[in-house]
């Protein structure tokens, strides 16, 4: 270092001096791939070097294993809830399914921890124990069955229950207002 009297040695040949109190000091004197740590987290600023910091200006994050831009440290700034899946990074409701509905295991209901799937896309969740469950998870035209007879309440849907409050009747083929089940009510 002919123009810098504070440095005189560079053991790893990276262009940064070995004197820790000198100008442009090398924090890794035996590693030519790293020399500085801007955020003081112990990981070098060169992201492609040994123990490189993916977030050189954030002391709470240093690794991003899946490369989605969210750090792997769960206690750091903007943590990645799914550090091994680049298609997911957050889980607002804590149900284990990612908020990105188009990603792997996407949550159809990112603000409801009791529901995550809706296979028929009718807006009602498939988890029967959750909020607003779909009584017919594979049929998009039906979602509720008030009387529990297996026929849906939506009159415009498939296999509609013509008597949604009577579990003994569901069909009225002739439209006379009386159910077709001879053993049922009315």
Label the predicted regions.
Residues 1-186:
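Extracellular calcium-associated, cysteine-rich motifs in secreted modular proteins
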